[in-house]
Swiss-Prot record:
It holds the Pfam family Str_synth. Residues 61-73 have a biased composition (Basic and acidic residues). InterPro entries: 6-blade_b-propeller_TolB-like, Strictosidine_synth_cons-reg. The gene is SSL1. This is Protein STRICTOSIDINE SYNTHASE-LIKE 1. Belongs to the strictosidine synthase family. Keywords: Glycoprotein, Signal, Vacuole. Residues 61-92 are annotated as: Disordered. Glycans are attached at residues 67, 122, 196. GO terms for cellular component: vacuole. The keyword Glycoprotein applies.
Amino acid sequence: MESLLLIAYAFLYLFLLSHEAEYKINADQSENSNVGRFGGNYGRLGRLSGSIHHWTGEYRGLEKRPNHSEDNPPSRGWTGEPGLDPRGEGPYVGVTDGRILKWSGEDLGWIEFAYSSPHRKNCSSHKVEPACGRPLGLSFEKKSGDLYFCDGYLGVMKVGPKGGLAEKVVDEVEGQKVMFANQMDIDEEEDAIYFNDSSDTYHFGDVFYAFLCGEKTGRAIRYDKKTKEAKVIMDRLHFPNGLALSIDGSFVLSCEVPTQLVHRYWAKGPNAGTRDIFAKLPGYADNIRRTETGDFWVALHSKKTPFSRLSMIHPWVGKFFIKTLKMELLVFLFEGGKPHAVAVKLSGKTGEIMEILEDSEGKNMKFISEVQERDGRLWFGSVFLPSVWVLDRQ
């Protein structure tokens, strides 16, 4: 067995070495040039500059949060979705112990707003995460002020404007349990919710298994709030992650991670009930968010790297790396050995890439999993770091 491992790692080393230059993006290009291998229609490089505010869970008033104690630390990792409520307050973020925190200014910092599980007092350990929940994909309903979110263990949840214990909205679709509810969006005109169920086998705690195992068991789902009926609108998806509704509600986008494809489901119009490919991404997508003008921002977990290509040649290769490598090393190799940040803006009409923002050195931000644009600002979140960044584009 040891000799087999040595041969495999030797092969990996030679593969990475021989392909290293091919997948690099030149970080020294001018702002008016195309982005390396992304080329041509793949937009322009907009560097992330010093006009970035960085808020973390390590300071800025967290010690003033009610009910805070040393046994129940405020920051245990973030979901990467800095949601903003209809009044412009926040951002709101979810953490690994099942809570949703709200930024309440410099004096109060992050305060507890809501939580997924009634077992709140026992949720200070990662070991009980499946029972305590993991808030993902925060979306506010404008007319009610209610916060809807996907929980990576418990399904789709809802909490009122005043916060507190969330209630379950849906955890089963067509007789099958929702295993890994991911990002969601709300169609307020149709009173419907769209969300991804990333896998029928793995939940949030097994995220790497979910997209390296090769199983196409992910689903995009529509839930009718009036009839309380849920139906699958797209199936056989390979780890669908981000999801967003178009500005006119005519279509829904769902991002597959391994294939780098953005699938489109037509909810209205002459093509209603059909699906097609909306875009091909230059990396592995996390969340996708619609802008106020109808375009879309996609956060890329990482660019396509030699290691990621190798690990997805065949499911057994990915499973081999999961079993033999520590999670930290697996993430490091997927990032190409250098944590960085890449955000892509897609045209809401054509799916073409309009703009790319990249911090190739990871100096200002890295490991981003969400980009949300509002009032001339870009909000970034991270699934691996207890951080929220805001970039003032004005």
